[in-house]
Amino acid sequence: MDLIADHISHRFGGLDVLDDVSFTVASGEVVAIVGPSGCGKSTLLSILGGLLRPSEGRAELRGAPPDNSLNPLTFVFQDFALLPWCTVEANVEFPLVHTALDAAARQAVVDDALRRTGLSDFRGAYPKQLSGGMRQRVGIARALAVRPAILLMDEPLSALDSQTRELLMEDFVRLLADGTMGAVYITHNLEEAVRLADRVVVLSRRPGRVREVVSIPMTRAERGGIDARGKLLTLQNQLWSLIREEAIDAEREVQHA
């Protein structure tokens, strides 16, 4: 397995946020994480990426701590976090500047990342000159430049309009098609989850536990066809029912506290 979450629990002060969360991400697999608000999804992603140490349990990337530079992973957030004074090309190159790559090798990696995200013709543009969707593409290209084993994505499309979100979902499908890179994808949008993921991990209300793991029985290419729409909608409804049950139970607990 590329990525392992092994009995992860976490608390902030006296507040339990995650409780005994375990799952795996195989090489080239995409796992979506969904659940009610406040269930610890972003906290879990920070632990998987080595930004936060769990109170209990462990995360491993190819048998080593996730912040081990030999097994790179990288984040794509809702906030693009681009350097406004740098061009698109310079933003994509930024994470490579202090690596062992020489200038020619860095340029080759940047060129490839720009090509894969459709940004080759925008390399000289500045972030303020780009739409929200294009800025998010720059963020994705920057993530791809480090050649990650795992891409960690936290609501990467939530700030975008529906048309741009659809275009970027198609981009993600294309980028993940060769199976060389896995991903963990946090989203509130269940359509995104069933379109992009191989499996969906449903977390319970806080403290987040694994309520259920739902497998998507189609390839991502098959999900784009008209015949798949009914099956995908059924899966969305299944996920929504699970999350709704957790949200209702959480509200009852508050009322009886």
Q: What are these model-derived regions, one by one?
A:
Residues 57-68:
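Conserved ABC transporter NBD signature motif
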Residues 145-149:
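A short, proline-enriched helix->beta-strand linker immediately N-terminal to the Walker B motif
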Residues 126-130, 134:
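Conserved ABC ATPase signature
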Residues 86-94:
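Short coil-to-helix segment of the ABC ATPase nucleotide-binding domain corresponding to the Q-loop/switch region
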Residues 97, 104-122, 174:
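Conserved ABC ATPase "signature" region
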Residues 49:
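Helix-to-loop junction immediately C-terminal to a conserved catalytic motif
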Residues 34-36:
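The feature captures the beta-strand-to-loop junction immediately N-terminal to the Walker
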